[in-house]
Regions:
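Pepsin/retropepsin-fold aspartyl endopeptidases
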Residues: 1-116
Length: 116
């Protein structure tokens, strides 16, 4: 296990890892994939990995793509392939922003029916 700086991206379909992280982990590609990013299209390598979130939640056998995200100081970009496995929430109670994620999904969160 290697600690990694990650970004949760609801606009990303899939999860990506930096070229550097793929090398550090000595990953062997399982294939190639054509992808479309905000900066254009590319053919990238695919890998199978286990991702540990918050040192406790393990997401096994995730197909990830290598990416230039290392240029942004990131090791992992977590996309909707992982986010859609569970419940994802952001709150800003008392001026403090908090993020929460759990797998499996347990219920719909809908604040419109909550009395103020």
């Amino acid at each position: 296990t290697i600690p990694a700086k990650s970004l949760w991206d609801t606009g990303a379909t899939g999860t990506c890892i930096s070229y550097d992280l793929a090398q550090k982990l000595h990953l062997t590609p399982i294939g190639f994939q054509n992808i479309q990013t905000p900066s254009g299209s590319a053919q990238v390598k695919q890998y199978k990995v286990h991702i540990v979130l918050n040192q406790e939640l393990v997401v096994k056998d995730v197909t990830v793509f290598d990416s230039e995200i290392g240029q942004q100081g990131l090791d992992v970009l977590i996309g909707m392939d992982i986010i859609s496995l569970g419940d994802f929430a952001i709150s800003n109670y008392d001026g403090t922003t908090q993020f929460s994620f759990r797998i499996p999904s347990q219920e719909h969160v809908d604040y419109k029916d909550v009395a103020n």
